[in-house]
Amino acid sequence: MEGGARTPEDLETLLEDAFVLRSGEAMAELFENCAVLVAEATREVHGQEEIVRLARQMWQRNRSYLAEPRRIVQAGNTALIMTQHGANVVRRGPDGAWRYAIALLSQDHIPPRRTNGAAGESP
């Protein structure tokens, strides 16, 4: 991730990209060291290492992420990103890049990943 996310919207797009590419390295760069991710119903993990571990488990089940911010409220270096099925708190670091501090991704917000349009698979 060259230079990181320059806006909260960019951060959402980069998270979607990390899911599509299934890149643990890219995923880790999007979260603060002590970040919290809540996904897969009520599963809560803390820190970059645990977040990457959970993401890899989600990828094994062909889960993806769709960036669809509905509203962004920003106060200085902190922003709240509201999506249809979740909410994320993000902060701009000293390097100017935005990172997730808290990410709440509901089960509905994590669609199964399409795999070559095989019959019987849902989008």
Q: Language-model segments: which ranges?
A:
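A beta-strand edge to alpha-helix "cap/lid" segment located at domain peripheries
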Residues: 1-26, 36-123
